[in-house]
């Protein structure tokens, strides 16, 4: 591509509404332009990157044996009513009617559409397993679109859906897709982690997320220093460490006026938060008569409650909800001063986190306003109904697989795979005839990659103060050739044209910067756009038989012979 025929839409200043670095650099590099809130036009520079991501995803999906389809973004509302998600999905689902007053939605996902296709086209177990995928636009009417294409309303996804006769077959395809995703993100040149994840609103029995590690990520990822273990912090198990020591202190009540938070109390008492417990009083599961009990959750003072773990306890109501003031009053409890002493005797279920369960001589609420207890010990002073993993893991915790300790970093979710089971096939009646001639409900899996999000995530992981530093596989151009004073020096232009033709013939994606611009402007643009290799051709270099080469990550340029240059580019 000749730069003189290409749209350069670079900006010198960062737009005020761009918050994260990927949004800033995509605007400045001329990759995207905002059309409306959460809607972006992809310019030629951005489209080249997008298509390269698209190509790698498509190649690996085809390699996995999946078959490409293309489904409508506009979907009949009746399908969503069948699945039960028409009302469940909430305002992110854009609903509308056509001129004939028929209700439709703009698809944020395609489970309903693909299940409808499968129930009409798949008739026998002999057609299973099968895996369909598409690369298609989605629309979610986000209340606050932000971070550019990272959280936009309209975006491109690769979504795949598999259909199976057995759980074993689903597991086989799930494993294939896990490996396929790992190959995709490796080829994209990203530092990523596959992590165990919660199945969330889509549902199902097993789930992994694929996260690109970046400081701007929205999720906390815990991974082992010595193994492949990795999990979303929401899912990572907090391993029990140590045993409870025998009591050495007497139980005692102390005045703590107006000290309600654990931090305030520990500072007031000159105590270590690690030697304290804090209470969270939540609603339990209602009984047959509709009575809602109170459940007391206790954690170590320096730990945070993991709501997803708490909601998985069979005695805790989901979604998690705090006990009401009326419920607290019924048991004579005061928020901010609740301790475990006497709660079991009052009929309150006391669930204690593993780390809190091994404490002795600890600080706790006194169950009286403006008072706390010190020297509290389990069994002697307070009873436990059950010990349960309730907390978020922290850096330095033992890895659940017994290998190394946990590190925690921020991650950007770019892929997600689920074992859906029969959630959608049951709801939409997707059945095939079995070997015995009887119909059975098929089992499903689904697998998504945020294609547009991958582009932003790659930038969040690869940039400096000059601009983007693309992994070569998805750079808009792999190589930029800059002939110095090309409009005055036919010799440099001729040499640039010859090298341009040669590199293109070798399969490189090359930009010949033949613009009538100052060298400084060209260099700034090329660094901002993140082109991995820059070759400058000048009169002095031609006299010496060398080319000036600079890799995007290099601090200094170097003069190379043609043979050295070609060897460098071939690596």
Swiss-Prot record:
Catalyzes the attachment of proline to tRNA(Pro) in a two-step reaction: proline is first activated by ATP to form Pro-AMP and then transferred to the acceptor end of tRNA(Pro). As ProRS can inadvertently accommodate and process non-cognate amino acids such as alanine and cysteine, to avoid such errors it has two additional distinct editing activities against alanine. One activity is designated as 'pretransfer' editing and involves the tRNA(Pro)-independent hydrolysis of activated Ala-AMP. Keywords: Aminoacyl-tRNA synthetase, ATP-binding, Cytoplasm, Ligase, Nucleotide-binding, Protein biosynthesis. Consists of three domains: the N-terminal catalytic domain, the editing domain and the C-terminal anticodon-binding domain. GO terms for molecular function: aminoacyl-tRNA deacylase activity; ATP binding; proline-tRNA ligase activity. PROSITE patterns: AA_TRNA_LIGASE_II (PS50862). This is Proline--tRNA ligase. Belongs to the class-II aminoacyl-tRNA synthetase family. ProS type 1 subfamily. It comes from the Bacteria. PANTHER family: MITOCHONDRIAL RIBOSOME PROTEIN L39/PROLYL-TRNA LIGASE FAMILY MEMBER, PROLINE--TRNA LIGASE. It comes from Acinetobacter baumannii (strain AYE). GO terms for biological process: prolyl-tRNA aminoacylation. One of its GO terms (cellular component) is cytosol. The gene is proS. Homodimer.
